[in-house]
Amino acid sequence: MDATPYLLVQLSDPHITHPGRLISGRVDTAAALRHAVERVLQIRPRPVAVLVSGDLVDAGHPAEYAQLRELLMPLVDAGLPLALLPGNHDARGPLQEAFAGLARVHRGEPGATAIQYALDLPGPLRLVVLDSLMPGRPEGGFDDARLAQAQALLAERPDMPTLVALHHPPHATGLAAMDAMSLQAGLASFEALVAAHPQVQRVVCGHLHRMTLGRIAHAAVISAPSTAHQVALDLAPDAPLALALEPAGWLIHAWGPGLPLVSHLALAGDHERIADL
């Protein structure tokens, strides 16, 4: 039996800005994403897809999406399927226009607004992408229409192990400022939806700019760090929201014969391999 695992890479919160602009005058998010893409292309075995879990750009501007597209094109050119979803810094229309034909950014229904869809990956594993964007608001939520579509996507393959992706974390983390803008509207309904579908093995998200591990219903929830800047780790109840120049990173989700769904943290940078033991 071939024991080669299947890999899904999760990048998150690249916050691409207008060319030449730095976040907080310090962070070159384009250079950070370029490095992440270079590292993804070096991963072996070759990933079966790349998920980017929201806050793709910083202000939802078409010029930012144009730069994001350019930065992600090496993945497209390498034949890696892209799965994109919006975060609170994104705008659906410009995102869909920039990536039409290059990535899954809509399910294709005429007049659809929410970016929700499923990809069946080898292994097998079903990736269900959900849209928690509430335009003009930092927190996330699901309305009845999106919850109904999520239910339909999960009901299509109840027999297939499933990973659900959204931008906003569906539970508190102890980061008070971020918890105030987590998934809010429809949270109880989303938890009930996950509970009703035992095939959901993992829920993954972004937004936090940190790796965290939690749970909703029976499923583990893991958040990805940003490919650029991180949110400072301060668990005091009155801690302000602050950014930190901690190491960037991404997640690699692995599964396959004899291997349950396992999530690994990869850190940005060139790390010396000191010995083969």
Give the positions of each predicted feature.
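Active-site environment of divalent metal-dependent phosphoester hydrolases
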Residues: 16-20, 58-61, 84, 88-96, ...
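N-terminal active-site segment of His-dependent metallophosphoesterases
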Residues: 1-67, 114, 173-176
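Active-site neighborhood of phospho(di)ester-bond hydrolases with catalytic His/Asp-centered motifs
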Residues: 10-12, 49-54, 81-87, 131, ...
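A short C-terminal boundary segment appended to hydrolase-like catalytic domains
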Residues: 250-277
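Active-site-proximal beta-strand elements of phosphoester/diester hydrolases
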Residues: 5-18, 124-134, 163-165, 219-225, ...
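Active-site-proximal segments of metal-dependent phosphoesterases and phosphodiesterases across multiple
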Residues: 22, 141, 157-204, 208, ...
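His/Asp/Glu-enriched short active-site or ligand-binding loop at hydrolase and phosphoryl-transfer sites
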Residues: 224-235
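Extended active-site neighborhood of metal-dependent phosphoesterases/phosphodiesterases
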Residues: 62-156, 186-190, 195-199, 217, ...
